[in-house]
Amino acid sequence: GETMTDSPYSAIRHQQISVFPGEFSGSEEALFCLVSSKPLSSQAHDALVASAQSLGYHACQLAFIILATQADTAPALSTQPKDLFLVLEAVDPFAIVLTDHHAVEVASSAYNVPLTLEQRELLLGHGCCCFESFEELLKTTEGKQKAWKCLKTLPLLSVL
């Protein structure tokens, strides 16, 4: 029962997402994308959803992308940088959060830019935050503050 606008663009987007070698959940029209190389803990998931909401994004405007890594699939089926590039550009979010080292590496290759951890970055105009391990940061108050300091640099969704 997803309602999809019948524009050629949404059909192309749906096609790109459907062939993505990895997991894609959430909205195909997401404005806020979370990329990780393995499923997030419920604590990390909830913290990221709460962060997105505090920046003005609605839970239905989020997408979660989990890369398929070689450890759990045949190498041919693992997510390549170009796969991540295609899926992110198909969705075209305002904000991208890379939650772990492998996700940062793949995105860095995908966009051919060096990415700095815990500092505001731009990926072809998308606001981006990169974390070595978002889950580790959540274990301490200081870590949570560091994570939020980066997350709050992401584009705010101005409420109309």
Residue ranges of model-derived segments:
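A polyanion-binding, active-site-adjacent surface
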Residues: 1-160
